Amino acid sequence: MAKAKNEVPAVANPDDKLKALEAARLQIEKQFGQGSLMKLGNNSAIGNIEIIPSGSILLDEALGIGGYPRGRIIEIFGPESSGKTTIALHAVAEAQKQGGIAAFIDAEHALDPQYAKALGVNIDELWVSQPDTGEQALEIAESLVRSGAVDVIVIDSVAALTPQAEIAGEMGDSHMGLQARLMSQALRKLTAIIGKSNCMIIFINQIRMKIGVMFGSPETTTGGNALKFYASVRLDVRKIETLGKDDDEAWGNKIRVKVVKNKVAPPFRKVEMEILFGKGVCPYGSLLDSAVKQEIIGKSGSWYSYGDDKIGQGRPNAVKFLEENIDIAQKIEKELREKLFPGRPFVSSFVEKTKEQKEAQEKAVEALKKEEGSKEDALTGNKDETDDSAQKNSAASKAKRAEVVGLPADDSLF
């Protein structure tokens, strides 16, 4: 009986199996190129994941590997004004500190250059695009990734990636699933080249409510389900409370970040951070809390000590000490990262702020104060600031600010 044309021969001998596998590998590499098939242990790009720090040692710890993985897709989602763009801009600043090139695709047309500068972003070296359509935004992202020169790309946001057909149509026209199909097609093209170029793409996304959900969470993200599958890390950012809202002025938000998906480390870790208006996440408070947790900084009563030296009584004074002594902060950070992430190369997140960054912070804070003041005037009419009780509330607010966040009670740093 003749053998079938497509019959696969059975190989029983182990040596013959290895020879057959080697012949198959050579044939695959001849057809598809060098490196198309390899053993996992021989691929250093897969075994050793490079990272970009998040700008907060607490968030780096929650991510499990010391930061965001390069060559992967990251999704940051949450309600409005929860700190999504702030977290993404901190990642951009950290990439630039390592000598990387960053791009920001501003689909919402809402990027504030002064605020980005206040967070440490070098806006002179930041590539920015404000596309008109979703197709244009994703094609720009693909071109940047294919160049192999860009380290991180931020797309703000998925909800603003409007398909061309929707823009060309009339107001009120139904475009069922159009954006989801656009995202699915784009991610299929992007996911392979992202890994080869070692570029990281951060998608900022909004949440919506599903109608008719009786059980479980009614929340979902925009753009369909494709991004949920292709993302290696998904961060759920929520605002817990507004700091200072019970006093005369709000000066920050306390947020909770939950790693709801993580393909490079265990997921579902949570971290709480304070975001200061006009300044972003305070890294020194995060460093102090993490170092105390890992017993690198000792805490006895209200006193904090590093080695044999006391660095401050109370959290505000300890944070102020670290901010004024960046060399000690860098030394503590190095010890902390070596303990949490052994084998990872160390690049400090703490650098002396330039004069331009300090001025940008002051401008951002003043702009926020004016904005809050105009809103208050519109709601309450003429505002009286001569009342003694208002002055007492102001003093109490500053004292509370110093206690919670770790800044001095005066206005020198706010």
Swiss-Prot record:
Q: Which InterPro entries match?
A: AAA+_ATPase, DNA_recomb/repair_RecA, DNA_recomb/repair_RecA_CS, P-loop_NTPase, RecA-like_C, RecA-like_N, RecA_ATP-bd, RecA_C_sf
Keywords of this protein's UniProt record, alphabetized? ATP-binding, Cytoplasm, DNA damage, DNA recombination, DNA repair, DNA-binding, Nucleotide-binding, SOS response
Biased amino acid composition, Basic and acidic residues: 361-384
Q: Where in the cell is it found?
A: Cytoplasm
The Gene Ontology CC terms held by the record are: cytosol
Q: Which residues bind ATP?
A: 78-85
Q: Where is this region: Disordered?
A: 361-414
Gene Ontology molecular function terms on file:
ATP binding; ATP hydrolysis activity; ATP-dependent DNA damage sensor activity; damaged DNA binding; single-stranded DNA binding
The chain's coiled-coil residues are none
Return one Gene Ontology term, BP aspect: DNA recombination
Stated family: Belongs to the RecA family.
Q: What does this protein do?
A: Can catalyze the hydrolysis of ATP in the presence of single-stranded DNA, the ATP-dependent uptake of single-stranded DNA by duplex DNA, and the ATP-dependent hybridization of homologous single-stranded DNAs. It interacts with LexA causing its activation and leading to its autocatalytic cleavage.
Indicate what this protein is called per its UniProt record: Protein RecA
Tell me which species this is from: Treponema denticola (strain ATCC 35405 / DSM 14222 / CIP 103919 / JCM 8153 / KCTC 15104)
* Gene expressing this chain: recA
